[in-house]
Amino acid sequence: MNLKLFPVLFFCLLFTSGLFAIENTKDTLTNQSNKPLRSYTTTRLTTARPTIDGVLNDACWQTGEWAGDFTQLLPTEGAKPTQNTKIKILYDDKNIYVAIRAFDTEPDKISRKLGRRDELYGDMVGINFDSYHDHRTGFEFTVTAAGQKIDLILFNPMAWDMNWNAVWYVKTGLEDSAWVAEYEIPLSQLRYSSDKEQVWGMHVWRWIDRLSEESDWEVQSMSGPGMLYAFGELKGIKDIPKSRRIEIMPYAVGKLKTFEKVPGNPFADKGRSWLGNVGLDAKIGLTSNFTADLTVNPDFGQVESDPSVMNLTAFETLYEEKRPFFLEGLNIFKFEMGDANLFYTRRIGHTPEYKPELGENEYLKYPDNTSILSAVKISGKTSNGLAVGVLQSLTANENAQLFSGGKTKDVRVEPLTSFTVGRIQQDYKEGNSTLGAIFTATNRFINDPYLEGMNRNAFTGGIDFLTQWKEKKYFLDAKFIGSAISGSADAISNLQLSSARYYQRPDAGHLNYDPKRTQLSGQGGSLKVGKGSGLFRFSEEITWKSPGLELNDVGFMQMADRVEQETEISYFVNKPVSIFRTYSVGIHQSNNWDYNMNYENSSFFFTSAFQFLNRWGIAPSVHYGTDWLNTRILRGGQAVLIPAIWEGNLMAHTDVSKKFFVNLSASKEKAGENHFTSTSYEATATVVPYNPLRLSFSLNYTKNQDNLQYVDTKVLVAGTKYLLAHLDQKTLGATFRVDYFITPEISLQYYGSPFASVGKYTEFKEITNARAKNYSDRFEVMHPMLLGGNYVFGSYSISNPDFTFNQFRSNLVFRWEYKPGSQLFFVWGNERTGWKNDANTKVGNAITQLKDVASNNIFLIKLSYWFSL
């Protein structure tokens, strides 16, 4: 069958089966939508405010209305909960007060396990306010039975941001046959309209850990289009003042770095250095629904290091954001399209791009990150449904210190740079449709000729549109993006030659490399249509990116010059059936072309997940990829035909509510012609020997054998040679965590992660006929001589590419939230990194040899103090 016709035939089949399912499947959402919304009418506080101590003996709790009659969501949707729950809500001009009484006929089995803040752990109760009442944003305040806080922002359809840390007060306590939670939530932590009488969306839920049971005050459905659409209503809030909140948090930090002494190096001859810093974070309520966040000279040190990675591809590794300023409230700035994102926050304050080459007896003190002078973001939503977000950040002229000829001088390694991001989204048709736009600008003020390889100005923009119909069952999601980059000829040449596009590819007739260009522009987009609620769901999507599209100045994108088509079908069962508590199955199919519609490959996935009645679970999946015309493997050379590949994966876990539980995973990949094989295993065990202490250990091992691993490109008089080899790579990693919780506010945590990867290159090859029908005709096996650490191939040579990379990273962190919003940290960070150009070490021995690698340490103390005006 012609694979180019497959998406058309597949979509026809999908559409037919979708119509059948619509006609014959009882849709939980439809039945749910016909039920009236639950509502709760709160009472204004007329007595003294409660003392937040987890004991409901204050006079105010004798007023107001208790509400109950929760409905089970898990494990049996719509059933009566096994335990009763009651809530009461009061308010005044400053706070919302909440009491939740979680009854339990077996109080000795209440799970009061301590965990980190924002960790869903043990028995829990929570309340979520959709204070905009727009069915798009919910502010959640959850507490565990042990008293640990969990706060998050909920978004539809089923996404959340757990990095939002509000300042609020809660205590828990025990009664004869219940546990209780007593809240004080400042109105300053919420955003709401200026209406005289407020109506908010409200969701209240409870989790019983030993039963894996969730019950909700309002009726929710796992098959719905999103939780916020099914929220109940909170009424009765009247005449509350407009919020003009001002929150300020200054901080001070001191660091001691220790490292290996290097005689003659003035930056390392003492083996230590002292650093100190002060700064300020502020949050200003411009109106009751718009907030400005400001940071001056921020401390963006990360408490936990990035994981170790051995990246042998041509593409950048995407790392998770961990800095609070760039985490909180940034959901509005998200604009993702496939693997591309117009705003990747780690571009701001990144490691400097330029690094000078050193001569003999020269030493360099190089900054880890670019200094952020200031950053401001303004975000909020009007009563008419217009969401607005603006972020602006300025990073400094960053200098390294170069010691040469007995003197030290500053060398500019990153120019002064301005980053601007703007985002708007307008709701229509009672939240069923949204229209939005985004704009980003990166402006570098370059005054040094050797920095002209960087882009001077980069602008990107996009428009997105989402509409839903038939009670939000069906949706159409459309995005259109564009970019315009300007800079020197060197800068634009770098973009043309980069792995995102490789304009120099000799067999890409639609591409034209021009070394004199000073501008580059491109566009892209995606169209997705499908059924997004109910037990049966499907979608069809097409995504395209023109060759000139470039997002990487303040966004993230690995590949341009792409057209992708994807089809997804899934079926979910959300009630116990036979031995299963829940299960889901899915099919995913995709086709890929370059922008000139030259076919590259197709992929087919089968995924599934099963949870058993004993709360153990497994998730098997299978992937098949057809023969692949890989346009990136030679990093600028012609496309190479790669054999088809099979992949199988299996994940399994035991009951995570137990004091000891295990997660396991295994995968196997194998391509035809013995082109590629990969086997990987990972196991994680977690044990809670007694309540305040938790231990976790994970071990992972991967073995890869790649017959066409890229090595080098040599431009010779006789022509360009693309050199590849057979790579045998083994990777071993482990992670050990210890968490000890003295109280919910005081904890001691340790994280340690050794990592090693050993790679041996053999059977070197030159590409001869990249698309030959027979695999062995696509290359010629070479027989170089190894002389003095170099492989000699006659007219050229390369250094030995074998490697042994090992690294150890660890953190020991003492945290004390001595008052809400204010913290004291003591941190010890340790890192050891080794590298050798040989593969004579077994990967396990490379781990043990870390003890002989020089150690770098950071000892840090940080104090922050939060107050409001």
Q: What do these predicted ranges mean?
A:
Residues M1-L5:
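Positively charged n-region of N-terminal signal peptides that target proteins for export
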Residues P7-G18:
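Bacterial N-terminal signal peptides
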Residues A21-D427, T434-A437, V853:
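Structural preference for beta-rich elements and adjacent junctions enriched in aromatics
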Residues Y169-L174, K261-K283, P449-R456, K516, ...:
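Outer-membrane beta-barrel proteins
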Residues E214-D216, S305-S308, A400-S404, N447-L451, ...:
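Short acidic, glycine/serine/threonine-rich loops at helix termini
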Residues S221-K242, E398-A458, Q468-E471, K531, ...:
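Outer-membrane beta-barrel transmembrane domain signature of Gram-negative proteins
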Residues S371-L373, S379, A458, W469-E471, ...:
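Exposed, low-structure sequence patches enriched in small/polar residues
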